[in-house]
């Protein structure tokens, strides 16, 4: 009985020791993505609702914390980067969540977002990781889009 307990303690000690071997700055983004990769929002400047539009969090990013996220680029249908005044309205928060205020002035259209992910030792840009579709308010309501907050 004592040998069994001693053996379990030794195995537990080895297990805890091996956890210390994680390389600081480890970052893997090969499987990164969003389950729903399209965020549909309304172009409705008259909306009284102040809850921002939000995407879900990114999945498949593995690494040592802290892991940071920022918008690397926002591109229009033709692949050109949009003006800074438009891109500045797309914020990336916490775990890679895209957030756009209800009172945004982003023109109607389809946009592709590149996301920069980095930590202490590594940095990756994930091109075209998400799509943002800005529709006239009536079309967004008719398509059944969800406004997440």
Protein language model regions, located:
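Sec-dependent signal peptide recognition
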Residues: 2-9
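C-terminal motif of bacterial Sec signal peptides marking the signal peptidase cleavage site
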Residues: 15-18
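Non-catalytic macromolecular-recognition regions in eukaryotic signaling proteins
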Residues: 20-149
């Amino acid at each position: 009985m004592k040998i069994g307990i001693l053996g379990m303690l030794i195995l537990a000690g080895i297990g805890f020791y091996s956890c210390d071997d994680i390389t600081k700055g480890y970052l893997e983004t090969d499987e990164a993505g969003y389950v729903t990769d399209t965020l549909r929002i309304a172009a409705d400047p008259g909306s009284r609702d102040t809850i921002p539009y939000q995407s879900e969090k990114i999945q498949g990013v593995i690494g040592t914390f802290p892991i940071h996220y920022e918008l690397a680029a926002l591109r229009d249908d033709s692949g050109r980067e949009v003006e800074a005044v438009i891109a500045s309205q797309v914020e990336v928060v916490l775990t890679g969540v895209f957030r756009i205020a209800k009172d945004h002035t982003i023109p109607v259209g389809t946009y592709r977002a590149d996301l920069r992910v980095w930590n202490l030792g590594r940095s990756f840009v994930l091109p075209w990781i998400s799509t943002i579709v800005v529709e006239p308010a009536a079309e967004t309501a008719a398509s059944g889009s969800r406004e997440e907050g």
